[in-house]
């Protein structure tokens, strides 16, 4: 009897194994469940005998189970476990329990959160995670690249605070308060920085005085939006869960700092609301340290005048932060906060409209590289070395991708402006999704045989469906989902190519599949909204030749194919 049961169990497991290229034959929820089971099997702590921690490695080789390591310049190795880079996975695990009825995934996610609060929260409230801190899964000790001074940093990470508050609201509150306390250097002028100091004593926080400064005032701290986004998001969630009015005031105040300097004519910008304080004279254009002043002014100022500032540079990468990551986050906060979020909605939608009006070229579905005043930099040759490239480099228009399709589709649900729809329509067509119509459901011809396998496209199509209830958009999303499973579900993990050495446990493909399944089951609230957030690890990394590779990012490790090694990046 036992033998028969064992054989039956093995046959069931065999049925659940889905070879690449055949995965569409099985339902999506089973695929996501199998994926998460594989993560828990291969990325878990196997180093501590019968008392393992609940923590997970960030990356794993699906073929061998080898967990991805960080190699420090002195040769030390650490199995990378950066909780800030696992927040999409936490949302997947929670959503999977909601849809499947199996509580084990939610429980594991809760255990991971609880373990971090119990073991990796310092006395200031900060967690050992982010751009320059992580846990070595082998030793369970906090690690970090020494040349980065082991500072705290979150940039577009958007932690799953809903889960964190449900596990330990007091510890989550301590973190958010500590986060702001460490990253606001001067509350009077709201000088912020992406780097925060661990162990900093708590200051006056929300009780601090504030004096509004003129646009682009000079500070030592760099007010990058990708760092500001996480501050805005965290304080807004503190208000949502704890009704902390001071947190809301400062969250909206910080968000407003990125709105006030927008160009008066175009409404574009800004990526920073300050400019770097010049503390030394540069001797080399190629040395782009912020102590020499605003990097855009140094490189573009002689030709374009005082408006050429870092905050005003509407270039590839910066615009993704502005009009995708920031937009998605603030659109969601606008919903979550009710009437208190109306300002955030207006600021966000107005910004997307401005970018559509001045930046979008529907003829070839590209965005123009620009200065916020509308100065088109398309095909501009850089006259000198600098922060934005070497002398002789040419700035080119860049494709409007699915990350923008999501934000424009979601914004259309808030404001049915044809300008927003025009951008969404152009991107969808260029991405091989067909014609989504002159308006929702009108004159459309979606491509139900599309080969698109981009999870961003799937999320965007669900947003189009949610905004319009036009069934064809969700049918198209199902086709994209099938393509994702056929082309990206490899050896039980999601990877862009079967040649990749490591799979990222924070992959968004299962997140997108789960969101679709929730929609089809009429349970959209079962899966957390997608905000396009992601954590990262950055620091010096030991090369095969014994040299130290400066400013190495974990995503570069995830891009390596089997047998490849990191190549020099030329950074000093």
Swiss-Prot record:
Its main location: periplasm. It is an enzyme of class 4 (lyase). Its EC number is 4.2.2.2. It is found in: Periplasm. It catalyses: Eliminative cleavage of (1->4)-alpha-D-galacturonan to give oligosaccharides with 4-deoxy-alpha-D-galact-4-enuronosyl groups at their non-reducing ends. Residues 1-23 form the signal peptide. It comes from the Bacteria. Gene3D superfamilies: 1.50.10.20, 2.30.30.880, 3.90.105.40. Belongs to the polysaccharide lyase 2 family. One of its GO terms (cellular component) is periplasmic space. GO terms for biological process: pectin catabolic process. It comes from Yersinia pseudotuberculosis serotype I (strain IP32953). Pfam families: Pectate_lyase_2. One of its GO terms (molecular function) is pectate lyase activity. This is Periplasmic pectate lyase. Keywords: Lyase, Periplasm, Signal.
């Amino acid at each position: 009897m036992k033998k028969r049961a064992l054989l039956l169990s093995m046959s069931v497991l065999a049925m659940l194994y889905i070879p690449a290229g055949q995965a569409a034959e099985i339902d999506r929820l089973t695929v996501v469940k199998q994926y998460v089971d594989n993560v828990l099997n291969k990325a878990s702590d196997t180093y501590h005998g019968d008392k393992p921690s609940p923590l997970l490695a960030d990356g794993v080789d699906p073929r061998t189970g080898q967990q991805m390591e960080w190699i420090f310049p002195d040769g030390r190795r650490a199995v990378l476990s950066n909780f800030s880079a696992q927040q999409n996975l936490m949302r997947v695990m929670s959503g999977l329990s909601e849809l499947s009825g199996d509580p084990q995934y939610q429980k594991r996610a809760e255990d991971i959160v609880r373990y971090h609060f119990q073991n990796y929260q310092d006395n200031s409230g900060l967690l050992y995670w982010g751009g320059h801190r992580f846990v070595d899964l082998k030793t369970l000790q906090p690690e970090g690249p020494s040349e980065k001074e082991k500072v705290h940093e979150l940039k577009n990470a958007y932690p799953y605070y809903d889960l964190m508050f449900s596990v330990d609201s007091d510890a989550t509150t301590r973190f958010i308060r500590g986060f702001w306390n460490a990253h606001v250097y001067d509350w009077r002028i709201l000088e912020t920085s992406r780097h925060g100091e661990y162990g900093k004593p708590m200051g006056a926080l929300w009780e601090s005085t504030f004096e509004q400064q003129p646009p682009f005032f000079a500070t030592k701290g760099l007010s990058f939006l990708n760092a500001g986004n996480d501050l805005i998001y965290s304080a807004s969630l503190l208000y949502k869960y704890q009704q902390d009015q001071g947190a809301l005031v400062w969250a909206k105040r910080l968000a407003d700092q990125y709105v006030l300097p927008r160009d008066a004519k175009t409404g574009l910008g800004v990526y920073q609301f300050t400019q770097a304080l010049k503390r030394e004279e540069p001797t080399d254009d190629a040395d782009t340290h912020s102590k020499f002043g605003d990097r855009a002014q140094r490189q573009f100022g002689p030709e374009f005048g005082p408006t050429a500032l870092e905050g005003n540079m509407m270039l590839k990468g910066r615009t993704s932060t502005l009009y995708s990551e920031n937009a998605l986050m603030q659109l969601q906060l606008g919903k979550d906060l009710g009437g208190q979020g109306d300002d955030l909605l207006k600021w966000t939608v107005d910004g997307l409209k401005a970018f559509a009006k001045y930046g979008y070229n529907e003829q070839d579905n590209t965005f123009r590289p620009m200065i916020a005043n509308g100065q088109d930099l398309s095909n501009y040759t850089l006259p000198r070395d600098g922060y934005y490239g070497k002398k002789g480099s040419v700035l080119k228009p860049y494709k409007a991708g699915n990350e923008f399709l999501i934000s424009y589709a979601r914004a259309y649900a808030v404001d049915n402006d044809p300008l927003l729809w025009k951008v969404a329509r152009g991107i969808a067509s260029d991405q091989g999704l067909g014609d989504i119509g002159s308006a929702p459901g009108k004159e459309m011809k979606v491509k139900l045989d599309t080969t698109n396998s981009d999870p961003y496209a799937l999320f965007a199509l669900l947003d189009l469906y949610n905004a319009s209830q036009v069934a064809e958009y969700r049918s198209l999303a199902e086709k994209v989902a099938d393509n994702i499973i056929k082309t990206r579900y490899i050896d039980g993990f999601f990877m862009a190519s079967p040649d990749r050495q490591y799979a990222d446990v924070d992959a968004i493909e299962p997140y997108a599949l789960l969101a679709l399944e929730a929609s089809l089951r009429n349970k959209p609230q079962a899966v957390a909204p997608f905000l396009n957030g992601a954590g990262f690890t950055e620091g010096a990394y030991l090369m095969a030749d014994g040299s130290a590779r400066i400013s190495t990012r974990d995503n570069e490790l995830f891009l390596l194919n089997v047998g490849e090694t990191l190549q020099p990046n030329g950074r000093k």
